[in-house]
Amino acid sequence: HVRVNADNPEDAALALEFGAEAIGLCRTEHMFLGDRKNIIQSFILSDDEAVKQQALADLLKVQTEDFLAMFKTMSGRDVVVRLLDPPLHEFLDDPRELEVAITKKEAAGASEEELAALRPRLRRIDSMVESNPMLGLRGVRLSVVFSDLPLMQVRAVATAAARLIKEGVDPRPEIMVPLVSITAEHVQTREVIERVI
């Protein structure tokens, strides 16, 4: 059996053309890059609950659209959806680059109002820096700390699948929880998933 890595419907369609039978890994973190990076940053960095909830709503919308397209392309075939896996810093601005940008703005005479938006952001990102991010806040641990993220992702998977079933499509999603090390991580994430499904 040939399963492929595919993170968008175009890759899934190409895989089918080459004879793939299923998607063995859909890396959802790739769906949060580009212009969507700002949305997940708003969720992670904000202390304002309303901003966090709006970011989650925006993420739910784009994730649902992504999964609708993926599952439709792969109708009748398995799609293994991995919940967010990479270290937290991959979703954030590089703190040293942000520090340089602030210094340049200060030197150029930027207004205090403009700088006031950047300084707290830098402090927040600096507070999240890890000495070894590959072993730190990533995979299931990211899901434990930010439990709304896997909840949103599972809701997007379930919503897309339910909608397509009503349209006569045969979605077959499977959910992978990354980097589980201890039973408690599995139990907590499973409880989150079961609240949706």
Predicted regions and their residues:
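Conserved alpha/beta-domain cores
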Residues: 1-197
